[in-house]
């Protein structure tokens, strides 16, 4: 069994966790949402400073919660890509320092691989191959998971990620940041069929549409025009109905592409990861469609949908058990394809 302490600081969560054999021993998350709410979104420099202020306490809390000594830790890991460079550097530097101080193996982990591994925290016996639907504020992708470190992108958004679309529509409706949870809550009492909105198909040069790629910029623009028209007419904004219609449109678009992709590639399991995996509309639509097509769909526990270090530790432990180690000179990258994961290891 492999026990790994991991650090996640790719954006606005300072997270530290210890995982043993895909079982979470401790998980600490210091959210920066209150800090960034006044700006309506994440400010990179503010995020980096907040990470610096909380990282040491988070590490100490994770060790205390796990009730483990450093002699029981087999490896130290940190998210190294993709993400905000300054934020990533805080976590990576802390992990390297701990690895050197305690003479432990060091591993850098791809943030999106972590979201794939979040499913293993509740489904430890899951075996590849399977389809991963990654839906977050920065990424929306369909990934063919072949084995640890081997991934193939089958579809993605051509512009705004799903989570980014939620935040932008929430800002348009003056709902605050982050937008996803607020829209989800309002949608519960709204009419999802009140407004017809575009699902964002991507045209192919030879005609027809890409079966797995999508676009959310047109949907965002459609909501903007809807709001402008209602305001011109002097009508009160039916926020609940707009939220429900928008959320249902996103859920349908993601569900159609995920189901089609799984069936076309003969994959019987769809594992969903990322912050939007917590969305109730997506969960309901995808579960119903999967059941109708004799497919299995897996969602992480809600606490592991958003950024956390447990998923990073889980991925790192799998790499460590295979003898994959990162050089202590490893740097951070703001962008890195999942297909390049193995470049992080020697």
From Swiss-Prot:
Q: What class of enzyme is it?
A: transferase
Organismal lineage? Bacteria, Bacillati, Cyanobacteriota, Cyanophyceae, Nostocales
- Pfam families membership: TsaD (PF00814)
- Any idea what this protein is called? tRNA N6-adenosine threonylcarbamoyltransferase
Q: Which reaction does it catalyse?
A: L-threonylcarbamoyladenylate + adenosine(37) in tRNA = N(6)-L-threonylcarbamoyladenosine(37) in tRNA + AMP + H(+)
Q: Where in the cell is it found?
A: Cytoplasm
Describe the task this protein carries out. Required for the formation of a threonylcarbamoyl group on adenosine at position 37 (t(6)A37) in tRNAs that read codons beginning with adenine. Is involved in the transfer of the threonylcarbamoyl moiety of threonylcarbamoyl-AMP (TC-AMP) to the N6 group of A37, together with TsaE and TsaB. TsaD likely plays a direct catalytic role in this reaction.
Query: EC number(s)?
Result: 2.3.1.234
Q: Keywords in UniProt for this one?
A: Acyltransferase, Cytoplasm, Iron, Metal-binding, Transferase, tRNA processing
Task: Please report the organism this UniProt entry assigns to the protein.
Answer: Trichormus variabilis (strain ATCC 29413 / PCC 7937)
Q: Where does Fe cation bind?
A: 111, 115, 307
């Amino acid at each position: 069994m492999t026990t790994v302490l991991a650090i996640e600081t790719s954006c606005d969560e300072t997270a530290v966790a210890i995982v043993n054999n895909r079982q979470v021993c401790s998980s600490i998350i210091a959210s920066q949402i209150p800090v960034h709410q006044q700006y309506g979104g994440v400010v990179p420099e503010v995020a980096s400073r907040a990470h610096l202020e909380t990282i040491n306490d988070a590490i100490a809390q994770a060790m205390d919660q796990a009730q483990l000594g450093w002699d029981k830790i087999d490896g130290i890991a940190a998210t190294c890509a993709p993400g905000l460079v300054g934020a990533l550097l805080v976590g990576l530097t802390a992990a390297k320092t701990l690895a050197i101080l305690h003479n432990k193996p060091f591993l850098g982990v791809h943030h999106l691989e972590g979201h794939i591994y979040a499913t293993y925290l509740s489904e430890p016996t899951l075996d590849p191959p399977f389809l991963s639907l990654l839906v977050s504020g920065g990424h929306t992708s369909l990934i063919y998971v072949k084995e640890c470190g081997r991934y193939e992108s089958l579809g993605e958004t051509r512009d705004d990620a799903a989570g980014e679309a939620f935040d932008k529509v929430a800002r348009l409706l003056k709902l605050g940041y982050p937008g996803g949870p607020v829209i989800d809550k309002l949608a519960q009492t709204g009419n999802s069929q009140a407004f017809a909105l575009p699902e964002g198909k991507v045209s192919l040069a030879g005609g027809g549409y890409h079966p797995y790629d999508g676009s959310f910029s047109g949907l965002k623009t459609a909501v903007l025009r809807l709001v402008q028209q209602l305001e011109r007419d002097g009508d009160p904004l039916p926020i609940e109905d707009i939220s429900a219609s928008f959320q249902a449109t996103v859920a349908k678009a993601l569900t159609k592409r995920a189901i089609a992709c799984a069936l076309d590639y003969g994959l019987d399991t769809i594992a969903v990861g990322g912050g939007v995996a917590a969305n109730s509309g997506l969960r309901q639509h995808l579960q119903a469609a999967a059941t109708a097509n004799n497919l299995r769909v897996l969602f992480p526990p809600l606490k592991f949908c958003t950024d956390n270090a447990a998923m990073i530790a889980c991925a790192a432990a799998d790499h460590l058990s295979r003898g994959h180690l990162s050089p202590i000179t490893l740097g951070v990258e703001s962008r890195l394809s999942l297909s390049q994961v193995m470049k992080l290891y020697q």
